[in-house]
Structure formats: C-alpha cells, structure tokens
Amino acid sequence: MEPAGPCGFCPTGEAQPARYTCPRCNVPYCSLRCYRAHGSCAEEFYRDQVLGELRGRSASPSRLATALRRLRQQRETEDEPGDAGLRPGPAPGGLSGLWERLAPAEKVAFERLLSRGEAGRLLPPWRPWWWGRGAGPRLLEELGDAPSGDAEELEPSPARMPPEPVRDEPAAVEQVLGDLPGACPPAVPTRIPALASLSRGRTSPLVRFQLPNVLFAYAHTLALYHGGDEALLSDFCATLLGVSGALGAQQVFASAEEALQAAAHVLEAGEHPPGPLGTRGAMREAARILLGEGPANQKSYTLAALGDLAQTLGRARKQAVAPEERDRLYRARKKCQFLLSWTNENEDALTPLALDCATAHRAHTVAAEDVAALTGELEQLWGGPLPPARRTLIEELPG
C-alpha cells in the first residue's frame, strides 16, 4: 500500500504523489532525489538499528558497523530508490526483516563469520595512514642490514592485511581486495612540551620500550575497527587499553621484545579478537610507524600516532560516566603525552626500536612456519587432523 498524500520534499506547487516513506520519521516522499534531500534521517535509522543489533555480539561488531559509511557511496550511484534498500509503503522492519529474508545457509555462514571474528572480510581492505607513497623502497633501505630478511617482511602489501578467506565459506561472503587510498595522517601536535617540564627527575632508560607496546596496540586497534568510528569510541579505547599494558596497566618493560610479547600474549590468549593483522602483522606495523617518513623526519609518524591517541583518549574520557573508567583513560592519555615529549627529544632511539620490532616479527614468522610444518607432518602421519584411537595391544580375557 502506497503512502497517501503528496511528497513532503517537492517544491511548493510541484508536489508529486508520495510512493515511499522515511523509515525513521514516516515522512512521505516520491523519488530518489527527494530521498537524498532527506538522506541523513534514513541513515541514522539504519545506523541505530545495526549498532543496536551488533553491540550484543562479541565478534568484531565495530568493523561491521563501518559498512554503514559505504551506504552513502552506494546510494550516490543508484538510479532507483528500490536499489538503495528501500521499498514502497510502510517503513521496513529493520534488521529483523532483513534477517528473515536470508536463506538458512546464508544465516549459518553469517553467524560463522561473527563467531570467528572474520566478518571484516565483508568489507574492503583498510589501508593504514602510515603507508605513504614509496614506503617500500625506503623501508628496504632503512632495514637493509636487518638479519634474516626482516626488511622484506616489512614491505607494504595491501593484500596482506585482510585475513585469508576460509575455504568452506560461500563465495558470496568472500572479500574483494582492492588498493584503496589510505586515510589522511593525523596532524602532529603543534605544541609539544619539553620533557623536563613533565618529569622532575631523570627519565628512566626503560621508557623507550613502552613505544613498541603502545604502537602495537594502536596498529591492531585501528585495523580491527577499520580506522575507528566515533559511535564506537568506548569500544575502541577498551580494546586499545586492553592490548597495551603500558597504557592500560602502567606496565614497565625491560626490552622491546618483552613489550611486544606482552601485547601479543593478550591476543594469543583470546582476550581480544586477533583482527586482520594478527600478532605478527601488528609487530610489522609498529616497526613501520617507528621508521616514519624517512631519515630526515623519522619521528613524524610516531608523533602523529601518539597525538592521535591522546586526542582519542581525551574524547573518550569526556563520554565516560564511571569514575574508574575516566581515571583509567586520564592516566593513559597522560602516558601518551609523556611519550610524545620523549619521542620528540629522542628521535635517534626510534631506528633501534624499529629493528627490534622487525626481529621479533621475523622470529614469530619462523616459529609459525615451524608449527605449520610440524602440524602438516603429524596430520599426514595420522591421516587426518586428529590422532587415531589407541589400539589395545594386550587384553585380559575373562576367566
């Protein structure tokens, strides 16, 4: 049944009969042109419905919510309102109506993606802002002396970031890889206080080892949340502080390897989803950030990342209600500001830290390859993924 009355968005005296209804406020409209004039209202409706549904799920809901931003791009290329996911008559039933229209196999496939934390495969790959143009050759030059091919492991490759497709998933949910442009780099803070103004005594030499831990968590969280979403700011910061012991628990590390292992252990223990990077990928991205734009301005990326973190934590603190959460976010923000001042005055320490990250990345890669090779040999010996049942060699017969 079509909505009664004229379109609510046509110019006065030119109103056409209404054929569609806004799903949020039920205002009638006649065409795609009028819908676009009222598009923000419809976007908010679908956004609220999707976020409300996904907040109850534990498998990376934020990266699915990011797909809402792509709806605007899709609508700009559509010719008919029906193609934009709208239908004549009353407002649609939201996610529940869409879910009911899925086939049983499609429902099972989608639930499997959520349970495995792989729903991000439905989205295009996200390109980090620190993947600047020509980064590959410069990284190879900077880490050319790194042992065991660490330099080659750090060469950017957009296709590496998304997880590998699962073989038993339908083709409809396989991700289409693309070379998307990266987000604009966050601005480096214009005013960075002197380190002496933040600390009365001598700065500990162990401060430097907190950077790999913080940047590991930063790269992991950005990739997991597909660049971040203001509506999920609280979730973003909870993941960030959960992965980074330096920010979330004021942890101190004796080496870069220990700092990276602490963050990697959080992911390997299943406390947070591994995301598209995994532990090795986050180590690799931490090294890239530490290397910066080049020898002439190496600290630029690290300063931009720490400044971005300080601003993000500040916004989250304003939204937080619980005193404990506000205090935790405040301390994490202060830590980022301290590291910002330290980095600004200790640029020479960044290259050794980047090499430590590259070495740790290579060690994890070799260990993973060894485990995969051993697993393959055992499965070949067993004839499957599980060992065969034990056979009874001697059995006592009843007397």
From Swiss-Prot:
Zn(2+) 1 binds at C7, C10, C30, C34. Residues 71-97, 141-166 are annotated as: Disordered. GO terms for molecular function: zinc ion binding. Keywords: Acetylation, Metal-binding, Zinc, Zinc-finger. Zn(2+) 2 binds at C22, C25, H38, C41. A zinc finger (HIT-type) spans 7-41. It holds the Pfam family zf-HIT. The modification N-acetylmethionine is found at M1. It comes from the Eukaryota. The keyword Disulfide bond does not apply. Interacts (via HIT-type zinc finger) with RUVBL2 in the presence of ATP or ADP; shows a stronger interaction in the presence of ADP. May act as a bridging factor mediating the interaction between the R2TP/Prefoldin-like (R2TP/PFDL) complex and U5 small nuclear ribonucleoprotein (U5 snRNP). Required for the interaction of R2TP complex subunit RPAP3 and prefoldin-like subunit URI1 with U5 snRNP proteins EFTUD2 and PRPF8. May play a role in regulating the composition of the U5 snRNP complex. PANTHER family: ZINC FINGER HIT DOMAIN CONTAINING PROTEIN 2 PROTEIN FON -RELATED, ZINC FINGER HIT DOMAIN-CONTAINING PROTEIN 2. This is Zinc finger HIT domain-containing protein 2. The lineage of its organism: Eukaryota, Metazoa, Chordata, Craniata, Vertebrata.
